[in-house]
Amino acid sequence: MTVLKMTDLDLQGKRVLIREDLNVPVKDGVVTSDARILASLPTIKLALEKGAAVMVCSHLGRPTEGEFSAENSLKPVAEYLSKALGRDVPLVADYLGGVDVKAGDIVLFENVRFNKGEKKNSDELAQQYAALCDVFVMDAFGTAHRAEGSTHGVAKFAKVAAAGPLLAAELDALGKALGAPAQPMAAIVAGSKVSTKLDVLNSLSQICNQLIVGGGIANTFLAAAGHPVGKSLYEPDLLDTARAIAAKVSVPLPVDVVVAKEFAESAEATVKLIADVADDDMILDIGPQTAANFAELLKASQTILWNGPVGVFEFDQFGNGTKVLAKAIAESSAFSIAGGGDTLAAIDKYGVADQISYISTGGGAFLEFVEGKVLPAVEVLETRAKG
């Protein structure tokens, strides 16, 4: 994967437009989770150090395109950036006609989704973005799977289009995990439905040695193998699909599970052997023996890809399985990559962020890359790099 990298460019005195993913949760005008902003800071600081006139853009939320809405304004992000950088970061609302920024200074553009044509990737809007800069830097991996004006269109028309350090690091890490992974490789894929992760499961079944499944996905595999799943969430119409995947790769199944009679924070948790699951039981986590078995598989791996918690970890009594696997990944010497919103929440809860080789910032983009799909915003950078 060959793209031009921002780190290799001379940015002195250049007008640089950086597309970041600053789509953060905001409550009462205050940023409540700053992970994405923190991830973008090294790129912004580097561009400033290189003497660029820096313009940063992003979307936030899902406003009606072409219309301003105060709740989706990037004003709280501009205030956060000002504090984080120790300098004024003005929020510019009217920028398409041109904006005055000096070398070494920075501005934040208002939400790109307030511009008509952003989501439809209009050439007219993309050309307006491109006219603002000498160099366009795509650094928002989380939106790389969407072909929009500020992620894809602008890269077609900008004089120079490059990948920022954050995007480049994502591509390098995913390439390492999926391109030619150190073997043996284990993948954990968990979620409510096989149908939503079918392409991921099929793609990983071709490169990994152990495909550990969790959540509703595991229930479908259990049912496909003839085990009772009670009233657990599973997909009866995908049993043959599960069997076909299990025929291609080792899919270790739970030997014990944690069940409850209801899905609730106050639900009583009971550990049962898989054969003992009753008709009115719901499987909400893997059991302690299964967690220990899976942890051993992870310890023997050289590459680990983790997408999804294996139980309802939001309720502590159903979090042990995810906790044990998180700790096993943390203690492993394998190259480990984790991605997906629920996965990041589990990593935070169990305090293992510093012990995972790479944590992907992109939810949908992460999954599409794992599926082997082309990410439009990356593809256009590759095309531009070829000249």
Swiss-Prot record:
Top-level lineage group: Bacteria
Recorded catalytic activity of this chain's protein: (2R)-3-phosphoglycerate + ATP = (2R)-3-phospho-glyceroyl phosphate + ADP
GO BP, one annotated term: glycolytic process
Main location: cytoplasm
InterPro entries (UniProt xref): Phosphoglycerate_kinase, Phosphoglycerate_kinase_CS, Phosphoglycerate_kinase_N, Phosphoglycerate_kinase_sf
Pathway(s) this gene product operates in, as recorded in its UniProt entry: Carbohydrate degradation; glycolysis; pyruvate from D-glyceraldehyde 3-phosphate: step 2/5
Keyword Kinase: yes
Any one Gene Ontology molecular-function term assigned to this protein's record: phosphoglycerate kinase activity
Enzyme class: transferase
Gene3D superfamilies: Phosphoglycerate kinase, N-terminal domain
Subcellular location as annotated: Cytoplasm
Signal peptide, first to last residue: none
Record-listed E.C. numbers: 2.7.2.3
Residues given in the record as ATP binding sites: K197, E314, G340, G341, D342, T343
Protein family: Belongs to the phosphoglycerate kinase family.
Listed name of the protein: Phosphoglycerate kinase
